[in-house]
Curated annotation (Swiss-Prot):
<feature type="topological domain" description="Nuclear">
    <location>
        <begin position="1"/>
        <end position="4"/>
    </location>
</feature>
<feature type="topological domain" description="Perinuclear space">
    <location>
        <begin position="211"/>
        <end position="216"/>
    </location>
</feature>
<feature type="topological domain" description="Perinuclear space">
    <location>
        <begin position="115"/>
        <end position="133"/>
    </location>
</feature>
<feature type="topological domain" description="Nuclear">
    <location>
        <begin position="81"/>
        <end position="97"/>
    </location>
</feature>
<feature type="topological domain" description="Nuclear">
    <location>
        <begin position="165"/>
        <end position="191"/>
    </location>
</feature>
<keyword id="KW-0812">Transmembrane</keyword>
<feature type="transmembrane region" description="Helical">
    <location>
        <begin position="5"/>
        <end position="28"/>
    </location>
</feature>
<keyword id="KW-1133">Transmembrane helix</keyword>
<feature type="transmembrane region" description="Helical">
    <location>
        <begin position="98"/>
        <end position="114"/>
    </location>
</feature>
<feature type="transmembrane region" description="Helical">
    <location>
        <begin position="134"/>
        <end position="164"/>
    </location>
</feature>
<feature type="topological domain" description="Perinuclear space">
    <location>
        <begin position="29"/>
        <end position="58"/>
    </location>
</feature>
<comment type="similarity">
    <text>Belongs to the nurim family.</text>
</comment>
<dbReference type="GO" id="GO:0005637">
    <property type="term" value="C:nuclear inner membrane"/>
</dbReference>
<feature type="topological domain" description="Nuclear">
    <location>
        <begin position="235"/>
        <end position="262"/>
    </location>
</feature>
<feature type="transmembrane region" description="Helical">
    <location>
        <begin position="59"/>
        <end position="80"/>
    </location>
</feature>
<dbReference type="GO" id="GO:0005635">
    <property type="term" value="C:nuclear envelope"/>
</dbReference>
<keyword id="KW-0472">Membrane</keyword>
């Protein structure tokens, strides 16, 4: 195992890469379609209908390329999460296993965003162009995106994302505290195994709630919706555990502070 002098910078580098990728993902999924950094459609006169789009090789080529990028991300994200690959990476990278997974995921997502091809001449599923929709729909989408991202960031702070990002493993290793997950209750471990992406609803809101839903955005939203749906498997035991934890936290928050009960 590498000395702590190398472990800490490696874990921090992975975290910084993931953080920068997250910022870029906000731009890619929200700022671009809402603020028009890169147009997602070329106007009603420049676009094909759905049947004509199926015969346009340039549109089909762009969608096929985007699909390959998304599949690359999905395969990487899923394959490296399997027990066999985790055992192999743990054997050779030790406590940096999670940091390696996070870094590879960030790089795969960077490839998706950097080489994504839009389809400005493709058809749209919906578009807010006529007034008053052209004014109010983008504003409503902007508000929902802001709320969704605030919820996502809040959940990241409340959820044990230091462990999910790989920082906690290195921190505990340097201090000789062992594996962070070994200190969690069996019910918490069971929940973590079923819910490693605790921002599903908010992310789907960001993907689908846009003023103009073109073909490339539709492909992005559909594939991530399918992937997130298949990646989550909460059952009644998980829901009961979440409910009990929520009630416990609400009870702690509702308790009077010292001197307030007098």
């Amino acid at each position: 195992m590498a000395p702590a002098l190398l472990l800490v910078p490696a874990a921090l580098a992975s975290f910084i890469l993931a953080f920068g990728t997250g910022v870029e993902f906000v731009r890619f999924t929200s700022l671009r379609p809402l603020l028009g950094g890169i147009p997602e459609s070329g106007g009603p006169d420049a676009r094909h209908g759905w049947l004509a789009a199926l015969q346009d090789r340039s549109i089909l080529a762009s969608l096929a390329w985007d699909l390959c990028l998304l599949l690359l991300f999905v395969v990487q994200h899923s394959l490296m999460a399997t027990e066999a690959v985790k055992a192999w990476t743990s054997r050779y990278f030790g406590v940096l296993q999670r940091s390696l997974y996070v870094a590879c995921t960030a790089l795969a997502l960077q490839l998706v965003m950097r080489y994504w091809e839009t389809t400005p001449r493709g058809p749209v599923l919906w578009e807010a162009r006529a007034e008053p929709w052209a004014t109010w729909v983008p504003l409503l989408c902007f508000v929902l995106h802001v709320v969704s991202w605030l919820l996502i960031f809040s959940i990241l702070l409340v959820f044990d994302y230091a462990e999910l990002m790989g920082l906690k493993q290195v921190y505990y290793h340097v201090l000789g505290l062992g594996e962070p997950l070994s200190l969690k209750s069996p019910r918490a471990l069971r929940l973590f195994s079923h819910l490693r992406h605790p921002v599903c609803v908010e992310l789907l809101t960001v993907l689908w709630v846009v003023p103009t839903l073109g073909t490339d955005r539709l492909l992005l939203a559909l594939l991530f919706t399918l992937y997130l749906g298949l990646a989550h498997g909460l059952d009644q035991q998980d829901l009961r555990y979440l409910r009990s934890q929520l009630q416990r936290k609400l009870h702690l928050l509702s308790r009077p502070q010292d001197g307030e009960a007098e």
